[in-house]
């Protein structure tokens, strides 16, 4: 499972590190990142914003109910799902920080104030639910790797960190990716990637390209923490202020050889993977997911990544009454609800569709996203959510094979897709510029097309079918 598929691309040129640096040290910044969290709130034009980090994306029903209550009593009544499987609350009062933190702590959603911003852990959301295993290609009957268990252990290690090489020096943008072997998390281009490779082993690398190391699955979370510590050590030695591994110049990046030495010092055995090539997989498809144990999971996405508290509560009630009492928030702004009787799954999926969830890959809303836009963001040149909704509701569905599409209110393109090709719809002030981006972030096919809002639906539908 670790070989012979294309590796993930470099970042789009418009989303590369924003400040220049020396070739050896990477970007030089005069301040740390400003990523919001549960404690560091962000003042937006529509009120204060909080980001609640969910390592692995998993919420218990009680935790999920709390978030709905917070959205209703403190926020604007909505929950935004992020591209890393976290939840954001908007429209909060500026003085709510203490109350918000207290309520999150009581439900285990803020286990460590000191480490909140570094708890960025994405994990394969269908792990253990659809029968996939990296061993399946060889006919093995071994159980699949439990990347959710990796996420829980990794989060505990991050929150317990108090060593000399303090992991709190990591940026809020540094991402740990835990992939069960299908390549879905690899496509997010994490900074430290763990991927199950079968037979109780895992591949470990910086970014998504080799060389890497093979470690025992039981050692994987500890190895990931040590990889992050190695990144910090290399960054300090180079004099860089890089937030992410890929921001370091190629000659100044951490190496598998030095990481192997660090693992050995910690009592973790590893073997080299000099030609490591990671698979690129796809996100979960909306619909019913059938498991080998006879139960089903429901996979849905939020329209433009945003749910009302009522929609969220419906999912929580289903999970509580008929499912496993857990919800998995995906990095593709969706939810996976596990553990339903197979015969009940179609009815429950229909109920979610009736409430406004995206439940089919045939929907025009599938793989469509947008930044906050006006009125929430002062930098935005348009109310991109309203324009996107009007465009997608026009009836020009592009089908299950359509490219992802993302509306952005300014050149920053906050939250845009990564990995494969996507349609970039950028507000210009008097319309939109529609561009198909390839895997490297460059333009694919014909040049960008500038249209007014009246012609936007047709332009977007045509761009999404680009091959």
Pin down the residues of each PLM region.
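Small-residue-enriched alpha-helical segments and adjacent helix-cap loops
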Residues: 2-28, 47-205, 214-218, 222, ...
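Intrinsic, low-complexity N-terminal interaction/targeting segments
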Residues: 28-43
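Short beta-strand/turn micro-motifs at beta-sheet edges
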Residues: 38-41, 284-290, 357-359
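Flexible, glycine/charged-enriched surface loops at secondary-structure junctions
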Residues: 78-81, 164-170, 233-282, 324-331, ...
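Internal alpha/beta scaffold segment
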Residues: 208-239, 251-253
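Short beta-alpha connecting loops at secondary-structure transitions
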Residues: 208-213, 373-376, 439-451
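Active-site cores of enzymes that catalyze phosphoryl transfer or operate on phosphate-rich substrates
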Residues: 278-297
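Short Fe-S-cluster ligation motifs
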Residues: 406-416, 420, 432-466
């Amino acid at each position: 499972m670790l070989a012979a598929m294309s590796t993930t691309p470099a970042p789009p040129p418009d989303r590369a590190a924003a400040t220049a640096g020396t070739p050896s040290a990477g970007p030089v910044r005069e301040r740390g990142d400003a990523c919001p969290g549960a404690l560091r709130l962000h003042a937006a034009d529509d009120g204060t914003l909080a980001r609640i980090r969910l390592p692995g994306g998993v919420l218990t029903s009680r935790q999920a109910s709390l978030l709905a209550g917070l959205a209703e009593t403190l926020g604007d009544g909505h929950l935004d799902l992020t591209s890393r499987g976290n939840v954001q609350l908007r429209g909060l009062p500026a003085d709510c920080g203490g109350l918000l933190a207290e309520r999150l702590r009581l439900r285990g959603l803020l286990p460590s104030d000191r480490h909140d911003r570094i708890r960025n852990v994405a994990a394969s959301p269908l792990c253990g639910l659809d029968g996939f295993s990296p061993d399946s290609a060889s006919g093995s009957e071994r159980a699949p790797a439990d990347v959710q268990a990796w996420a829980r252990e990794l989060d505990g290690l991050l929150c317990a960190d108090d060593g000399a090489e303090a992991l709190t020096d990591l940026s809020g943008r540094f991402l740990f990716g835990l992939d069960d072997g299908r390549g879905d998390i690899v496509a997010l281009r994490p900074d430290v990637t763990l991927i199950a490779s079968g037979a109780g082993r895992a591949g470990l690398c910086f970014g998504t390209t080799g060389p890497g190391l093979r470690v025992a699955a039981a050692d994987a979370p500890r190895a990931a923490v040590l990889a992050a510590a190695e990144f910090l050590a290399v960054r300090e030695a180079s004099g860089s202020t890089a937030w992410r591994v890929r921001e370091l110049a190629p000659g100044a990046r951490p190496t598998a050889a030095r990481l192997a030495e660090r693992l050995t010092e910690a009592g973790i055995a590893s073997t080299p993977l000099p030609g490591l090539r990671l698979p690129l997989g796809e996100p979960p498809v909306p619909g019913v997911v059938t498991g080998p144990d006879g139960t089903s999971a429901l996979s849905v996405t939020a329209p433009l990544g945003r749910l009302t508290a009522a929609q969220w509560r419906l999912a929580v009630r289903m999970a509580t009454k008929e499912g496993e009492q857990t919800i998995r928030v995906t990095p593709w702004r969706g939810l996976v609800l596990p553990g339903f009787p197979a015969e009940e799954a179609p009815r429950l999926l229909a109920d979610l569709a009736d409430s406004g969830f995206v439940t089919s890959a045939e929907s025009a809303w599938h793989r469509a996203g947008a930044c906050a836009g006006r009125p929430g963001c002062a930098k935005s040149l348009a109310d991109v959510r309203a324009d996107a909704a009007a465009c997608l509701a026009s009836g020009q569905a592009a089908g299950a094979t359509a490219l992802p599409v993302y509306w952005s209110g300014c050149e920053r393109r906050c939250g845009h897709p990564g990995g494969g090709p996507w349609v970039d719809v950028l507000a210009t002030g008097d319309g939109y510029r529609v561009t198909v981006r390839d895997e490297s972030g460059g333009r694919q096919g014909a040049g960008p097309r500038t249209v007014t809002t009246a012609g936007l639906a047709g332009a977007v539908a045509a761009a999404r079918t680009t091959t």
